[in-house]
Amino acid sequence: MTNKIIQQIEAEQMNKEIPAFAPGDTVIVQVKVKEGDRQRLQAFEGVVIAKRNRGLNSAFTVRKISNGVGVERTFQTYSPIVDSLSVKRRGDVRKAKLYYLRALSGKAARIKEKLV
């Protein structure tokens, strides 16, 4: 169990509004990229294959296919470089970690859309 002072400091740091998302969802993450002296936003769109809920240390992994090559990127949920996060579509999966998608390609790697 963590100290109450540490919990209070972590709660102050977790002030960012994060939409509800789960593994299998397609998300667009706006990432702050610094190039020289200027800063811009870069969109990283892909499928959430893993999510780690640990308060301030929460993280999620997004996978996309770029020019035929699989690219995975892990983001700290409350990191200052993550500007915004939006859910593009909801996926219907039955596992918490979708690491099996790494071995699949093309149409086999598709995820059913959740009907609400």
Curated annotation (Swiss-Prot):
Keywords in alphabetical order: Ribonucleoprotein, Ribosomal protein
Any GO MF annotation of the entry: structural constituent of ribosome
Cross-referenced PROSITE patterns: RIBOSOMAL_L19 (PS01015)
Key word Ribosomal protein present: yes
Any one GO biological process: translation
NCBIfam families the record matches: rplS_bact
Function of the molecule: This protein is located at the 30S-50S ribosomal subunit interface and may play a role in the structure and function of the aminoacyl-tRNA binding site.
Protein known as: Large ribosomal subunit protein bL19
